C-alpha cells in the first residue's frame, strides 16, 4: 500500500510516517518507481509506535522498546533492560503528574479566591 493508504488505516499523518522512516523506525520496501510500498508488517509497526507514543514515551525510548513489543497491546518479549527503561519512564510520568497537580492546585486556588 502507499503511504496515504497507511496514513488512513492507522490515523498517523503522512508527514509523521515519513518522520518515522527518517528516524529508522520504519523501513518500507521501494517499488521500481521509487515509491514506498508499505505492507501489513509496517502497519503493525506503526500501530505499536502509536501505542507507545500514547503511553507518553519519547521517540528514543520507542526505538529501544519497539523490537520488544509483540502485539498492538502492551505485551512485551523479555528484552534486555526493558524493565529498567519502563521504570524510568513511569518515574518520569509520575514527576509530570505531580507537576500538573501542583499547577492545578494553584489555578483552583485562584478560582476559589475570585469567586
Annotated model-derived regions:
Residues 26-33, 37:
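Beta-hairpin "wing" of winged helix-turn-helix
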Residues 17-20, 49:
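Conserved hydrophobic/aromatic packing and binding residues within compact polymer-binding modules
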Residues 6, 13-16:
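Short glycine/proline-centered loop/turn elements that form peptide/ligand docking sites
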Residues 22, 28, 54:
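Short, conserved catalytic or interaction motifs in soluble domains
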Residues 8, 21-22:
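Alpha-helical residues within the helix-turn-helix
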Residues 2-8, 40-115:
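Arg/Lys-rich, alpha-helical DNA-contact motif
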Residues 10-11, 34:
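Conserved beta-strand-loop-alpha-helix junction that forms the acyl-donor binding cleft
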Amino acid at each position: 500500500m502507499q503511504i496515504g493508504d497507511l496514513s488512513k488505516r492507522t490515523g498517523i499523518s503522512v508527514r509523521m510516517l515519513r518522520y518515522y522512516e527518517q528516524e529508522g523506525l520504519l523501513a518500507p520496501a521501494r517499488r521500481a518507481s521509487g515509491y514506498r510500498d508499505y505492507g501489513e508488517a509496517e502497519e503493525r509497526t506503526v500501530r505499536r509506535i502509536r501505542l507507545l507514543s500514547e503511553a507518553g514515551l519519547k521517540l528514543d525510548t520507542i526505538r529501544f522498546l519497539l523490537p520488544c513489543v509483540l502485539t498492538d497491546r502492551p505485551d512485551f518479549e523479555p528484552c534486555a533492560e526493558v524493565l529498567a527503561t519502563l521504570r524510568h519512564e513511569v518515574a518520569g510520568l509520575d514527576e509530570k503528574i505531580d507537576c500538573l497537580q501542583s499547577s492545578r492546585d494553584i489555578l483552583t486556588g485562584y478560582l476559589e479566591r475570585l469567586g
